[in-house]
Amino acid sequence: PKTDVNESEEVSVVENNKLSTYDDSEFWMTFEDGTRVHLNYNTTLKYPPHFGTTTRTVYLDGEAYFQVAKDSKRPFRVITANGVVKQYGTTFNVNTHVPGITKVVLVKGSVSVLPNQGGEYKIKPGELAVLQADTQDVYRRY
């Protein structure tokens, strides 16, 4: 079931659901909107019980592979310690295992990498974006 939750409410309830994997485990999960997520080893994902009407937001520490269900009215956002990855329906991997660095690899579709200090960097399939927390720079590699 869907609920009408605004952004500020989402932030407060996101702590209610937390899924963690450890050295010897990984995990696949599917959200109510059809988005699939694979959590790699030593990863924590925080998420709301239900996505809101304007956005779908999760919080990641570690590495996860996302197969995001298309929804042009509700972008999917992955928030990390260094910035945000935003998209509307695509497949990508986010890795935050190295402190101060977020790596995003796009498999198909398009995503934007948004450093905490502002700016937006779009990447294409096959590209790797590396966000450095100390400088807030985003580097693209092919």
Predicted regions and their residues:
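Single-pass transmembrane signal-anchor helices and their membrane-water interface zones
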Residues: 1-5
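The conserved beta-strand core of Leucine-Rich Repeat
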Residues: 7-10
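Short, small/hydrophobic-biased targeting/export segments
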Residues: 13-133
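Conserved alpha/beta core segments of nucleic-acid transaction machinery
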Residues: 132-142
